[in-house]
Amino acid sequence: MKLQTEVLVIGGGATGAGILRDLSLRGIPSLLIEKGDFLSGASGRNHGLFHSGGRYVVSDPEAARECIVENRILRKIAPHCIEETDGLFVSLPEDGLDFRNRFIQACEEAALPALLLLREEALSLEPGLNPDLLSAVKVPDGAIDPFELVLANAKDAEVYGAGYLLHAEITSLVVDGDRVKTVLAKDLLHGEEYLIEASYLINATGAWADQLLKLAGLHIAMALSKGSMLITNQRLTHRVINRCRPPSDGDIVVPNHTVSILGTTSVRLEDAENFEVTPREVSLLIQETSKMIPAIEETRFIRAYAGIRPLFQSGEKGDDRAISRGFVLIDHEKRDGIKNLITITGGKLVTYRLMAEKTSDLLCRKMGVDVSCTTHLKPLPGAEKPSGLKDRLKTLGKVETLCDCELVRREEVEEALREGKLKNLQDILHRTRLAKGTCQGGFCVYRLLGMLNEWELAEGDSNKILKGFLEERWKGIRPVLWESTVKEEELMEGIYKGIFNL
Amino acid sequence: MHYDLIIIGMGLSGLMAAKTAVEAGKKALIIGKGMGCLTLFSNTIDVFGKITETTRLRDDLSRWIYDHPEHPYGKVGVEKIEEALCSFNTFFRPPYTFQSRNETNSLIPTGIGTFRPTYLIPSTMMRGIALKEKKTLVIGFKGYKDFYSQRLADSFECRGTTLSLPESPSTEITATALARWMEQPSFREFIGTEVKKQIRDEELIGFPAVLGVNDPMGVRKDLEKKTGVSVFEIPVLPPSIPGMRIFNRFKERLIQRGVTFLMGYSVSKATLKDKRCEGIEILHPPVTTSYSADHYVLATGRFMGGGLKADREKISDPVFNLPVSQPGSQEKWFEKSFFDEHPIHRTGILTDSSLHPIDEKGELILENVRVAGTILSGHHFLEEKSREGIEIATGYWAAKQALN
């Protein structure tokens, strides 16, 4: 199939979706292409921290300043994606108070509101904290739902005329002189081939940025840093809990809906495709985070996962955390003489909008168009909607729930299917809270597949899809199998290998 | 209170041990936290589904046992396994019986559209074996979200339909609710009439396994009368109504014969001295009660049952703290693929040939304790498809040996 667009945005993470929305609000025709579903990369695999900037305020004040500005904007345009929890930076006896004092001063310099709490004050806000803590500093951290955020951006872009192609991978970039002339792509599910003609291309592929540039014979130095996280079965604290010391392994616990996410590690990777959470990382995360919240030692985990931070390499060796978390915008016209190609990489989820704005500004300059950004003013679709859990609880017993862990109603799934263009199981799981609870989809995916048969939407062999899902689920569960998760697993194996002989 | 035999664990192996004891004229106490995995997973009696030869299972199994003396079956032996199965069957006289077809494994349809090999099949499921040859209609119920007739129809290449039920008090229906309703004549009248309307030229009707807890054959007969077509049951997601039938039958018969049932209790302490168990305690706050017996059977199941406990370091038995074979460190417990055979499933309590607990060196640990059921080491019931067979055989044999 032959497609034409003014701008082709490559990558369906927060950055790509943000750019797609920004451009369409400016009236520039754009098309997004993504080889998986939206959020298949780092955007869907992070700890969901809604940064205040506190985490970088000492090491990278520039990134911190960006964070706090964007933090304020997102509270206005995407309140439905954010839980305003606040965050505490906790000092333990072994940390001393030097870093804390530098931290408070840096917050002041970056105009980041920070309030020093005494031990008793901190413990009364968060009784689960280590009672030996020295003090805590309160900052406006929060929790963000990247799925809601990215899908809302894509939805709004669509309203303003943009399009997107999911599960389609670029196979070749044809360079002719100083331009990328055509793009060849392939639908990974059905094999259809696309020939795309775009006046401009934006490479927003995150960890895959260099891989894409290789197709045009270009290269940038990227460091791929794996960060691993663990999800608990319950929410441990109301607020985000950070360790008040230079960023290190296992120093953050972020509440997320009904669970908490423990993070993170930092391990250099060579390959963006094959990575897993190692037993060493699991032990390290539990050991370190339980110093802040002792109950973590005994808590039940439901899943481990890892994401890749795409870091633009500065050249020095050492801890990847030292590489700036600020973003990098590359005009390949200046750098490589390719006039119609831009790469945007690095950055944080919370600065996705700013990254999109700067990218679109650069593009407009190149195009000679003079339209300004409005994404900081216009709320995202869904912003008027109240938060979900209370509504879910109200419907309990009155409607059919597909997922008993996360109270996902049958109608919600029907709605997601109606809205659209969902091509595989993962697409459905990304758009609902199915498979995100305690049983990790052990029951609800079986039910979902049964319903797809009823609705005559089942494509292919349902049992093969179920097997594929169970394997995918296994990757997340295997690293945390002890105590009650071993029981849960015995149940799942008893069902699928036992009763059902799958 | 003093007993001849105390059985800890109320799953199928514990129940079989209690049956064996009471039939030998002994005074028995059975203690259980719950009904065990019986009411979750058991529908039919698996003995060794892995063997799919068409010859008699007994012959294949004795050949297999010869090469696997460390397996629980190796300790019991084929003759005693058969004896145990016969003993189990004495609780299931017609009309609801468990039978094999030609003394070999048969393939029965499951609630996910696959077939599974099993040995003794309850009367309500037997006709499912013919699903491939006969035109079949599969019935589901709107609001019963654990069974999807259309999905089965797609897999089995037959027809499926979903019935809407009248005046359901909730939008969601459970297997247990359906099983209760099935026992009401008015409900069957409705189902019979609705199903009859749907039948075209089908010779078989498949229902999820919810045809009543107490009198499934009565329910089936009535449905067949109303529809004019043969009816069978299909195993579904837990809970298992057929498993409840087994549990209820044992409970009723054992209590009649004088077995003491302590349900909802777990052992809080065991007093051990000189390789003997001298007594156990049950804490039911604020009261602690002590019980003692000449012999004990430990039949507490695996992880779900609470018989084995896995912390991040090791796997242990919380009742007697018996030696458990360890599958290495935690990262080695499970393989990379969900569908692999995981080393953790082979762990369990080590025993000698008479099911006494022993340590790694073969040293006897407790001379008046026997171990039965899936908590034993050296088997892999999921791979072997041997869950109920191991439970029945070792429960029977543990009690036999203890009371010999």
What name fits each language-model region?
Chain B
Residues M1-E83, N89-N404:
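Residues forming the flavin
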